[in-house]
């Protein structure tokens, strides 16, 4: 049985047993593949495509196709997929999640299902978390696919539409979740079909699937246009909020209104709920607000906008912490990702919160933007025909993957047994005692030379610990959002002998910590000191060949330095192995067990030894907010000395319960987000389908004729309700009809001879006569294009307004819960009514536009709004700028592609 005997849950064992015969079949081709020439191996791709055309399925050809990729990987990269990697490949092909530990070679695994599914000709998207990894994997693994005759593309920030279209047309495309999502939204804003860049959503392989489909699931992708609202109110609301007094709610208090019932004599103006990160006015505060802003009733619907500004100012000042939730850099507010600790370049908080923080910090307040298009990652990725993913940590969230995405998780055995020892948590009575214990632990371990990686959950904690280590004379590196430029370098060297590294959660997804150090980074650092430019250094380890003499010479220097440092790091690694590998210290438990497991997983890769331990205090946020009565009882007892750890099974259980409680809460929040977005998603599909009909050049004439009939019928139903024609509201009806039917078209002298039905038929007939005459005057073909142009313009304008209206509805809908009404159901019902109103409004404006159109020489489609920003993830807005010497036509391109400037970014200059 081999690896299949690894200890997994019985359900997981069953899944692995089912896959075992497939793995044996793949391995049975090994010898025959080795005997093929390169050309014969490449020809297998042609053969597979032919077999698919003749009726075989992807499952039929899987064993042989995987064997082909395995052999090609060895010939091209010198790497051959292990047995456990073959298991991972099968799981991915089946549309499931492969949980593979850090260092098990997930990148190489993805080549197997990517190749197999690309044979169908429908495209495969490999999804990574940043542009660097997308480019690296395209150049690295792409060589295997290209060797086998497939085309490989990459989608990164800065490509124009033609380049994007070309890369999406490839058999396999690498890119980030943000790039794929934004391109989907932009494709549904284009006014000509030829401007679309994507070609359908067939199969996606998502790397770090938990990060993308869970951690980022609450953040919608938003494409915005510039709003025109004044920013003065943010400043006024901030000044008002700064003059108030408040208190933090006890974790057991449920709702702010309890305060006003039970603490009438208190005079605080607002309450802060740390659990939910919200702040709200009390009755006392509400009266102050009404007096300050000169309004009679803050709860009046006319004052909804003012109340919203006040709430956001309270939230900004009392729940959003500088250097934890965001940093201030160059007079800008930059968001810090709570899961990774990275700065999220280009992203802004929505709903006015970003502006409220700008007002709080005294930087320029930028006006709110208008949403042009939006989608959540949940609904974007559920549109793929097949979805799969890989990560080192997914099992704890299996229920969510199953419920939301219909994907189960299969734990893949490690190639070598995990040798890392995960020690029992050390729990202290308060934070000071905990940090003192951490420093003492680091001092003791540091004496042995064992490398230490200390994981923190915020910039604030990392800097506090750094100051303590400085006082104790311990040399160390600090990695947090303020030093994110050096992230890869610091993480890569964290495994060196005698090294101490403090890192926020950003600690290295995508960058392996190699015991003994990373010779690649050492060689590059040396070359920087020698004066080589950034663009040359970025191209050194490109997998693309180059004919540029300067770059070839630089690569030769790099190879020599790499050999030198490899020898040094190999010796260093021996010393690290002797002292037990990398020691991981967690400074507190994260809300999610998965994030804790990710930190632990930095140590013990590929069978290396290692250790991990978490230090916890009863004052940590997790324990304070979610620990419950058990933790509170211990914290208030006063029985325990500060300098000794508390070793009680009840505390360990309380930590586990707290994490489970938070994970459950967060799952509930994400499910709730999805319930709301599902309403928008259904509407989005209708609009995008109608847009596609226009873009595909469909004849919209019958649709517009139907609109004319609907508009007239609805108008007559509204104004002619009485059975007797003399009681009809003819003046109002004619005022309405004359907005599109010219005056004098209708003969009303015989009105008494009509009933409502015959009158409706008469008005429709006369309207269509006018419409057909207009078509004849303009010409049929030109008139058909005018119909498409006007319909597209009206749909886009109305849809963008509707997105904002639905967003406002959602912001206010939560209050319905106080009236015993299900907010989601209310949102669904009212959203449907608003959607129907929008559809009616689209018909009215389209009909008016068509009746009032004048003969023109040329009719041109125009976008109703232009994108100013795309937010929702790590959008790499600041492209590197090369200063100093002008780039020559034959110089290496500064983008790092390895090509000459004239053949890359300079080809259109």
Curated annotation (Swiss-Prot):
Entry's cofactor comment: May bind 1 zinc ion per subunit.
Entry GO terms, CC: cell envelope Sec protein transport complex; cytosol; plasma membrane
Cytoplasm is among the record's keywords: yes
Source species taxonomy: Bacteria, Bacillati, Bacillota, Tissierellia, Tissierellales
Record's keyword terms, sorted: ATP-binding, Cell membrane, Cytoplasm, Membrane, Metal-binding, Nucleotide-binding, Protein transport, Translocase, Translocation, Transport, Zinc
Binding site for Zn(2+): 893, 895, 904-905
SMART domains: SecA_DEAD, SecA_PP_bind
EC number(s) from the headed UniProt entry: 7.4.2.8
Top-level taxonomic group: Bacteria
Cofactor(s), by name: Zn(2+)
Region (Disordered): 866-899
UniProt GO BP: intracellular protein transmembrane transport; protein import; protein targeting; protein transport by the Sec complex
HAMAP family to which the protein is assigned, alphabetical: SecA
Record field: catalytic activity: ATP + H2O + cellular proteinSide 1 = ADP + phosphate + cellular proteinSide 2
Gene3D superfamilies in UniProt: Helical scaffold and wing domains of SecA, P-loop containing nucleotide triphosphate hydrolases, SecA, preprotein cross-linking domain
UniProt protein name: Protein translocase subunit SecA
Assigned protein family: Belongs to the SecA family.
Major enzyme class: translocase
Membrane topology per record: Peripheral membrane protein
Subunit structure: Monomer and homodimer. Part of the essential Sec protein translocation apparatus which comprises SecA, SecYEG and auxiliary proteins SecDF. Other proteins may also be involved.
């Amino acid at each position: 049985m081999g690896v299949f005997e690894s200890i997994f849950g019985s359900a997981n064992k069953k899944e692995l047993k089912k896959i075992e015969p497939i793995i044996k079949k793949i391995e049975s081709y090994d010898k025959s593949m080795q005997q093929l020439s390169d050309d014969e191996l490449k020809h297998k791709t042609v053969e597979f495509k032919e077999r698919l055309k003749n009726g075989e399925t992807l499952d039929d050809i899987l064993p042989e196709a995987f064997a082909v990729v395995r052999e090609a990987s060895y010939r091209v990269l010198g790497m051959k997929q292990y047995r456990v990697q073959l298991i991972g490949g099968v799981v991915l092909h089946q549309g499931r999640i492969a949980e593979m530990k850090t260092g098990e070679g997930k990148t190489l695994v993805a080549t197997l299902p990517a190749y197999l599914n690309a044979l169908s000709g429908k495209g495969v998207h490999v999804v990574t978390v940043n542009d660097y990894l997308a480019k690296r994997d395209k150049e690295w693994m792409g060589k295997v696919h290209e060797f086998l005759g497939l085309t490989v593309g990459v989608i990164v920030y800065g490509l124009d539409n033609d380049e994007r279209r070309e890369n999406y047309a490839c058999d396999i495309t690498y890119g980030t979740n943000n790039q794929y999502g934004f391109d989907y939204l932009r494709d549904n804003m284009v006014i000509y079909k030829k401007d679309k860049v994507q070609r359908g959503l067939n199969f996606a392989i998502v790397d770090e699937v938990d990060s993308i489909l869970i951690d980022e699931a609450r953040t919608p992708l938003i494409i915005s246009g510039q709003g025109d609202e004044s920013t003065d109110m943010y400043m006024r609301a901030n000044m008002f909020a700064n003059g108030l007094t408040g208190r933090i709610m006890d974790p057991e208090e449920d709702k702010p209104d309890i305060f006003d019932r039970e603490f009438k004599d208190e005079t605080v103006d607002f309450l802060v709920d740390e659990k939910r990160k919200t702040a709200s006015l009390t009755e006392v505060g509400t009266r102050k607000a009404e007096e300050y802003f000169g309004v009679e009733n803050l709860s009046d619907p006319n004052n909804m906008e003012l109340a919203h500004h006040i709430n956001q100012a309270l939230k900004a000042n009392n729940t959003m912490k500088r250097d934890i939730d965001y940093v201030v850099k160059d007079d800008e507010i930059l968001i810090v990702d709570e899961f990774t600790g990275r700065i999220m370049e280009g992203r802004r908080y929505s709903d006015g919160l970003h502006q409220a923080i700008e007002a709080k910090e005294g930087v320029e307040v930028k006006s709110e933007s208008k949403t042009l298009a939006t989608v959540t990652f949940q609904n974007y990725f559920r549109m793929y025909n097949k979805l799969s993913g890989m990560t080192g940590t997914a099992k704890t969230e299996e229920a969510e993957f199953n419920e939301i995405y219909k994907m189960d998780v299969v734990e893949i055995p490690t190639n070598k047994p995990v040798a890392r020892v995960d020690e029992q948590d050390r729990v202290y009575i308060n934070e000071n005692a905990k940090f003192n214990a951490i420093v003492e632990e680091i001092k003791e371990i540091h004496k042995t030379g064992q490398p230490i990686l200390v994981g923190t959950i915020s910039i604030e904690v990392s800097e506090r610990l750094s100051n303590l280590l400085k006082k104790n004379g311990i040399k160390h590196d600090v990695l947090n959002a303020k030093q994110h430029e050096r992230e890869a370098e610091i993480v890569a060297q964290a495994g060196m002998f005698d090294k101490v590294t403090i890192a926020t959660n950003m600690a290295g997804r995508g960058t392996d910590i190699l015991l003994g150090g990373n010779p690649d980074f050492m060689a590059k650092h040396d070359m920087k000191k020698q004066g080589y430019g950034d663009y040359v250094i970025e191209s050194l380890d490109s997998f693309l060949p180059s004919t540029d003499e300067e770059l070839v010479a630089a690569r030769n220097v790099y190879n020599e330095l790499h050999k030198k440092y490899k020898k040094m790091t190999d010796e260093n690694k021996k010393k690290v192995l002797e002292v037990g590998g990398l020691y991981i210290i967690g400074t507190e438990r994260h809300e999610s067990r998965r994030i804790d497991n990710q930190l632990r997983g930095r140590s013990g890769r590929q069978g290396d030894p290692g250790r991990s331990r978490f230090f916890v205090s009863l004052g940590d946020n997790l324990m304070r907010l979610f620990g419950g009565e058990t933790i509170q009882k211990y914290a208030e007892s006063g029985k325990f000395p500060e300098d000794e750890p508390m070793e009680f099974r009840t505390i360990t259980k309380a930590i586990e319960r707290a994490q489970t409680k938070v994970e459950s809460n967060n799952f509930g929040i994400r499910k709730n987000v999805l319930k709301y977005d599902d309403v928008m998603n259904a509407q989005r599909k209708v609009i995008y389908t109608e847009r596609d009909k226009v873009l595909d050049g469909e004849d919209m004439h019958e649709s517009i004729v139907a609109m004319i009939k609907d508009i007239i019928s609805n108008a007559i139903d509204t104004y002619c309700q009485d059975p007797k024609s003399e009681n009809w509201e003819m003046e109002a009806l004619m005022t309405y009809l004359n907005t599109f039917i010219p005056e004098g078209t209708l003969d009303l002298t015989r009105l008494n001879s009509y009933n409502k039905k015959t009158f409706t038929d008469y008005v429709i007939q006369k309207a269509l006569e006018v419409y057909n005459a207009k078509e004849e005057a303009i010409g049929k073909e030109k008139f058909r294009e005018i119909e498409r142009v006007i319909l597209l313009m009206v749909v886009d304008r109305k849809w963008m307004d509707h997105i904002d209206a639905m967003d406002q509805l959602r912001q206010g809908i939560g209050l319905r819960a106080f009236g015993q009404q299900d907010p989601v159901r209310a949102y669904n019902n009212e959203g449907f009514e608003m959607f129907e109103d929008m559809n009616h409004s689209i018909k009215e404006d389209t009909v008016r536009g068509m009746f009032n159109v004048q003969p023109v020489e040329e009719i041109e489609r125009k976008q109703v709004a232009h994108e100013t920003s795309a937010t929702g993830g790590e959008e790499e807005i600041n492209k590197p700028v090369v200063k100093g010497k002008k780039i020559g036509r034959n110089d290496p391109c500064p983008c790092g592609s390895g090509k000459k400037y004239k053949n890359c970014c300079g080809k259109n200059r």
